[in-house]
């Protein structure tokens, strides 16, 4: 053994760890701030839509066409969304366009405003991944910045939902299915908790649900049910992912034009949703609600 060689190795490792920690802190603050803006605007839009749903819902098809136009006009590559993140994490892509951040935020805001359904977790992860990957490329981190990318994904998820523990493990396992990127644990944890604290400090509301019942993990029956439900939920998630991929491929083959594709789906959807609004008036839980026209 060479003591001087070992010492140099320790110094190199300490320097590397320090850089990852510092990067995680900076990214956590930046991504948490973006999450706060995105989340607060989304909450405002949701309240506004709820108060004017009858007026806004018929314009859902036009909103969809507008979103397609935005991507095609400004950066069509960004329309791949999470696929870009996965490819970057697996080393199959050199960069993620920064245009993805404003486009995915605007697309989600528009979708929610006109009554469409768009998840927030994907947006949060894409925001964090895009910013962190650009940061990693700018400062030439090793392994195509994979650790920094994972930290950014954790920051995006943790900043929007303020669930830092869940964000860390989600980011560590989502890039490569079936494996955990343990080397990214420390940077991901720091970035996630920093982003969560930042978005909270900037006034982003955290959703909380109080549970009146507790589960006993010493009860064999309860544990058996939990295992069965876990298997069922996993299979359901797998089925959904496969069907989603197949439907996208099918629609892409049948209707290659994205404008026709969005119209084919959104126009009937808007009609059915609009006609279904009358059910709100006769449903027991909401019969006293007033809908603004």
Predicted feature locations:
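Alpha-helical transmembrane segments and immediately membrane-proximal extracytoplasmic
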Residues: 1-283, 287-289
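Hydrophobic alpha-helical segments, chiefly the membrane-spanning helices
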Residues: 292-293
């Amino acid at each position: 053994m060479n003591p001087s060689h070992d010492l140099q190795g320790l110094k190199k490792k300490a320097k590397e760890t320090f850089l990852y920690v510092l990067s995680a802190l900076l990214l956590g603050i930046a991504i948490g701030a973006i999450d706060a803006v995105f989340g607060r605007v989304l909450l405002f839009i949701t309240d506004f839509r709820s108060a004017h749903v009858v007026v806004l819902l018929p314009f859902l098809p036009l909103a969809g066409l507008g979103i397609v136009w935005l991507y095609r006009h400004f950066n069509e590559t960004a329309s791949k969304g999470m696929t870009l993140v996965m490819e970057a994490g697996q080393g199959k892509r050199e960069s993620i366009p920064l245009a993805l951040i404003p486009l995915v935020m605007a697309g989600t805001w528009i979708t929610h405003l006109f009554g469409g359904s768009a998840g927030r977790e994907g947006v949060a992860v894409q925001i964090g991944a895009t910013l962190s990957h650009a940061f990693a490329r700018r400062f030439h981190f090793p392994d195509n910045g994979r650790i920094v990318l994972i930290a950014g994904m954790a920051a995006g998820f943790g900043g929007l939902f303020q669930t830092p523990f869940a964000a860390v493990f989600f980011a560590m396992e989502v890039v490569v299915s079936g494996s955990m990127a343990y080397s990214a644990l420390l940077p991901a944890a720091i970035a996630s908790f920093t982003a969560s604290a930042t978005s909270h400090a900037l006034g982003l509301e955290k959703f909380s649900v109080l549970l009146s019942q507790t589960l006993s993990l010493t009860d064999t029956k309860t544990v058996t049910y939990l295992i069965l439900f876990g298997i069922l939920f996993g299979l359901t998630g797998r089925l959904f992912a496969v069907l989603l991929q197949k439907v996208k491929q099918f629609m892409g083959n049948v209707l290659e034009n994205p404008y026709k594709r969005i119209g084919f789906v959104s126009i009937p959807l808007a009609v059915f949703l609009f006609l279904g609004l009358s059910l709100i008036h006769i449903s027991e839980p909401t019969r006293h609600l007033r809908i603004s026209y």
